């Protein structure tokens, strides 16, 4: 499998600046009982295939990256590279992978397996479920 790298400049990589933004509407999600509930109507970032958003802070126990993938499914990851520094991840369009925003470009498949870079282990993935106009991410 050939690895595709996101087009990021050296400063973005050195400072670990992710390409994926926080939600335009900070109220698009709620967290309760180990579940994140995302309202699709308030999360336009997830409307298009390849779209993604990062959720962090606001009482969440960990950072989460949510991706609307090319295969028609949604995926959620602990948004933390397993390499030194624990930088954030970004989806790589058309590849079924997410990649660390740092200089090492550690890359993982949607099942969390490492396929490129120095980390020794996988990233944590979370079960997701579409329930009407909501996406539920199970952190437990």
Name each region found by the language model.
Residues 88-93, 108-112:
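Short Cys/His-rich "knuckle" micro-motifs
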Residues 79, 96-99:
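Cys/His-enriched microdomains
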Residues 2-92, 125-140:
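N-terminal pre-ligand scaffold of iron-sulfur
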Residues 99-140:
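Short, Lys/Arg-rich amphipathic alpha-helical interaction segments
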């Amino acid at each position: 499998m050939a690895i595709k790298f996101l087009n990021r400049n050296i400063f973005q990589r050195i400072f670990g600046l992710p390409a994926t933004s926080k939600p335009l509407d900070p109220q698009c999600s709620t967290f309760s009982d180990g579940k994140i509930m995302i309202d699709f109507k308030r999360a336009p970032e997830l409307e298009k295939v390849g779209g993604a958003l990062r959720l962090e802070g606001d009482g969440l126990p960990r950072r989460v990256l949510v991706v609307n993938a090319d295969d028609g499914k949604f995926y959620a990851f602990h948004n933390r590279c397993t390499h030194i520094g624990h930088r954030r991840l970004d989806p790589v369009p058309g590849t079924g992978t997410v990649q660390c925003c740092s200089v090492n470009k550690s890359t993982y498949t949607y099942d969390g397996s490492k396929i490129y870079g120095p980390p020794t282990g996988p990233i944590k993935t979370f079960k997701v479920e579409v329930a009407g106009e909501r996406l539920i991410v199970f952190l437990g």
